[in-house]
């Protein structure tokens, strides 16, 4: 894409290394490996590229009287009413265009810091002085079961009862899974005490398998609202596990379109009323 030869690339890298006074790459066993200092260079380069792309997009938007937003969401947020709320926000505001990217929470924060994202919808928050938050909602984890499951008629289940069930869980790097594991550990239990038969990253697949009684799962209640309204699955709390968390809109500290934040929040709350 740059239309330059490999020797020219090597020359540019060498010149940059001399200018910065660091080694960006090291050759180990015939492979080029990025050094620790090189990782910092790459990180800053991504940030500069993100800022440049934002500048170009903002200039185009100002000419066309449009607004383009790139919003990152976790797999949980993708499956709750936030996607519907963003679609309604675009439909109600001519000139607004949103690109929605789904990724892990750690990758979303990285993209937020490198200006690849304007906003991120995340569960919880981290201590980062560059990131600010607006509380969007409060969510909690529940046990999700088929409407034909014996638990469906119960108001609560115990952890010991849950040990006997076939469990379908999110992957180990998911925030939902980690919150469940943390609460198990606070009760002197481990995930290995449970019969985990499937680990899946796709929320829709998990809910479909639950509905067809292939197992039970621990999910955020917000991702089950549509199924609950249609009577497709049942959710209930687990005794001694109060797995609550915040859903936040995260944004960089130099983000200035606060009207967008509050408009999204308003549409989200209006969308929630449909499922009340």
Where are the predicted features?
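A short LG(V/I)-centered, amphipathic sequence patch enriched
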Residues: 15-34
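Alpha-helical linker/hinge and terminal dimerization helices associated
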Residues: 17-20, 41-63, 264, 268
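Central regulatory/effector-binding core of bacterial HTH transcription factors
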Residues: 66-129
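A late-sequence structural motif
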Residues: 81, 234-276
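Hydrophobic hinge/microswitch elements
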Residues: 104-117, 122-123, 176, 182-233
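Beta-alpha-beta core module
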Residues: 129-135, 139, 154, 201-253
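Flexible hinge/capping segments at coil-to-helix
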Residues: 130-141, 145-168, 172, 259
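Secondary-structure junction motif
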Residues: 167-188, 258, 265, 275
